UniProtKB/Swiss-Prot annotation:
Pathway: Amino-acid biosynthesis; L-leucine biosynthesis; L-leucine from 3-methyl-2-oxobutanoate: step 2/4
Organism: Acinetobacter baylyi (strain ATCC 33305 / BD413 / ADP1)
Gene name of the record: leuD
NCBIfam families, per database record: leuD, PRK01641.1
Keyword Translocase among UniProt keywords: no
EC number: 4.2.1.33
Protein name as annotated: 3-isopropylmalate dehydratase small subunit
GO biological processes: L-leucine biosynthetic process
Family classification: Belongs to the LeuD family. LeuD type 1 subfamily.
Key word Membrane present: no
Length: 216
């Protein structure tokens, strides 16, 4: 998993509350358990004017010109700001997969659904909770500048605006450690690879029958 230290990027404003996971990535695209192939269908119902289905050539689909991700100034956005209760609905991990593959590493909102919030950390993304007044300010500043950027400093736990104004955010120390060091569940386990091999070696001597191949 890619480490998250300091990220600076263009901000895309999704001025909508209660964005659920079905809106983030519709159910018809959930047949794959791979973590790739979802970016083109992120916010499918909002990005396109027709109904999406797996296997389509998205380049040929009619796009909604009013949706933020179809506007040139937000095409390379890596920071998403949204309203309260972002990621509500079903527990599909495909939602952070789609956001991540599109290019978003940070989502800023006043609140998140718990399962989506947890899934972000497992996929190298940082969900930042800021109060509604601060989020309102970010929306206003973003509307006033087409290339509005934010800098997110995880070590300092700060979101910095182009003027240098900084907003502090809270994060669990363990999750912070994992993001800073690029550790997902597998990476955490591999940190103890030596101890695991030592345990297995001792177990082979004390309980050799456990490691014997079963024969029909």
């Amino acid at each position: 998993m890619k480490a998250y230290t300091v990220e600076q990027g263009i901000v895309a404003p999704l001025d909508r509350a209660n964005v659920d996971t079905d809106l983030i990535i519709p159910k018809q695209f959930l047949k794959s358990i791979k973590r790739t192939g979802f970016g083109d269908n992120l916010f499918d119902e909002l990005r396109y004017l027709d109904e999406g289905y797996p296997g389509q050539d998205n380049a040929k689909r009619p796009k909604n010109p009013d949706f933020i991700l179809n506007q040139p100034c937000y095409a390379s956005a890596t920071v998403l700001i949204a309203r309260k209760n972002f990621g509500c609905g079903s527990s599909r991990e495909h939602a952070p997969w789609a956001l991540n593959e599109y290019g978003f590493r940070t989502v800023i909102a006043p609140s998140f659904a718990d399962i989506f919030f947890n899934n972000c950390f497992k996929n190298g993304m940082l969900p930042v909770i800021l109060d509604e007044e601060t989020v309102d300010q970010l929306f206003k500043e973003c509307a006033a500048s087409e290339d509005y950027q934010l800098t997110i400093d995880l070590a300092a736990q700060e979101v910095k605006t182009p003027t240098g104004e900084a907003f502090k955010f809270e994060i669990d120390p363990f999750r912070k450690h994992c993001l800073l060091n690029g550790l997902d569940d597998i990476g955490l386990t591999l940190q103890n690879a030596g101890a695991i091999r030592e345990f297995e070696s001792k177990a082979k001597q004390s309980r050799p029958w456990v490691f014997q191949d079963l024969k029909a």
